[in-house]
Amino acid sequence: MLEKNKGKIIQILGPVVDVRFTTGKLPKLLNALRVELPTKEVFTFEVAQHIGDDTVRCISMVSTNGLRRGLTVEDTGKAIMVPVGKQVLGRMFDVLGNPIDELPLEEGGEKSSIHGPIPTYEQQKTTSEILETGIKVIDLLIPYAKGGKIGLFGGAGVGKTVLVQELINNIATQHNGLSVFTGVGERTREGNDLYYEMKAAGVLDKTALVFGQMNEPPGARMRVALTGLTMAEYFRDKQNQDVLLFIDNIFRFTQAGSEVSALLGRIPSAVGYQPTLATEMGALQERITSTRSGSITSVQAVYVPADDLTDPAPATTFSHLDAKTVLDRNVAALGIYPAIDPLESSSRLLDPLVVGQEHYKVAQDVINILQRFKELQDIIAILGMGELSEEDKKIVARARKIRNFLSQPFTVAEKFSGIKGSYVKLSDTIRSFKEILNGNLDDYPEDIFRYAGSIDDVIARYKK
């Protein structure tokens, strides 16, 4: 057996560790290095830079508390390897692929490097197919592409995580699909809640959970998205599955990269972000795609700092997305959830060649009415409804019904709202909005359109 390449720690600066290899054989960039203390505690670093004088600069994936200069470091000879395949379903892992649900992992299971190749053009699939989510506002106005990348944009507390949880629930229960949930720099409580909610809903055995929470070092938060992606890629490439990859929150991935960049001494670029922002984002996003063997559909929650969409972090994410779902505080203030702004959100799939002529026409009519309603808001605020023409009054009444009807009770929020969650098929969604647009429900009060499933629920409420 070959003797392992070993070095010694010569400097520790927070999560940055410098290691000198006297053998003259430096580990490659992105290799994983290990330190094991007599207490059996294991530390893992990733090589980030060769800084000269036989020394490598590494980023630690765990807290460096307990380390000291002079400790022996071992080069594993490969990148960070994480478990993949059936063994990860129903389980919860950290960035290094160690189980954190206090259950054992099978010995000798398959593992893959977190730094996988980007699929070539020949391997990629080029046709577009819609993924039905059962959420009316999404399916009608911002349809998601199977194998596409979707961004959920919103400030703090507008409902990004609840929307992600509902999507996981709907895909598992209605489509029997596999999901990988990656918690990047978010609250530990949310991960804990998600685990037990999914267990209670019976969808945990179709999901792998990977967490690098906000209390962990920046190295873990920067790499945990790649750990989740590696697990999803295995299902796509080796088991020919259609997989959903949820990343909550992609902004924290950028934020962790910014911290690491500063620790490595790089000069920051705009707004203090790392100069390699676009490169790091591209390396992650380009691996998320449909291939001839299967697809990875990615839903990424994107925190928008100070609700500013021009901030470099959300702006860089925008360029990779097929659909953007914008959650708006003003919609949430009206008590309408999911708090999606239908006029700010968009999808490249809303095209008659993809969704069909009927769906496209209904969606455009809904958008036109909501746009006209927005234009009339100032007149209504200053002069009141009485100054509007009869045609505009009709548009306002229908727009308010549509706005209320775009709300929907979620299964994962049942215990908070007390309203039974609903999954609405795309055909029912189109039929329901057609009824409102045609004026068949003009006599109905607008309040009964709130938190209904399909239009049949509204009619049943009216008849009561």
UniProtKB/Swiss-Prot annotation:
Broad EC category: translocase
InterPro entries named among the record's database cross-references: AAA+_ATPase, ATP-synt_VA_C, ATP_synth_F1_bsu, ATPase_a/bsu_AS, ATPase_alpha/beta_chains, ATPase_F1/V1/A1_a/bsu_N, ATPase_F1/V1/A1_a/bsu_N_sf, ATPase_F1/V1/A1_a/bsu_nucl-bd
Residue sites binding ATP per the record: 154-161
Name of the protein in question: ATP synthase subunit beta
Record's function text: Produces ATP from ADP in the presence of a proton gradient across the membrane. The catalytic sites are hosted primarily by the beta subunits.
NCBIfam families: atpD (TIGR01039)
Record localization: Cell membrane
EC number: 7.1.2.2
SUPFAM superfamilies: C-terminal domain of alpha and beta subunits of F1 ATP synthase, N-terminal domain of alpha and beta subunits of F1 ATP synthase, P-loop containing nucleoside triphosphate hydrolases
Entry's family note: Belongs to the ATPase alpha/beta chains family.
Quaternary structure, from the entry: F-type ATPases have 2 components, CF(1) - the catalytic core - and CF(0) - the membrane proton channel. CF(1) has five subunits: alpha(3), beta(3), gamma(1), delta(1), epsilon(1). CF(0) has three main subunits: a(1), b(2) and c(9-12). The alpha and beta chains form an alternating ring which encloses part of the gamma chain. CF(1) is attached to CF(0) by a central stalk formed by the gamma and epsilon chains, while a peripheral stalk is formed by the delta and b chains.
Gene Ontology MF terms in the entry: ATP binding; ATP hydrolysis activity; proton-transporting ATP synthase activity, rotational mechanism
Membrane topology: Peripheral membrane protein
Alphabetical keyword list: ATP synthesis, ATP-binding, Cell membrane, CF(1), Hydrogen ion transport, Ion transport, Membrane, Nucleotide-binding, Translocase, Transport
Reactions listed under catalytic activity: ATP + H2O + 4 H(+)(in) = ADP + phosphate + 5 H(+)(out)
GO cellular component, one term: proton-transporting ATP synthase complex
Organism: Mycoplasmopsis synoviae (strain 53) (Mycoplasma synoviae)
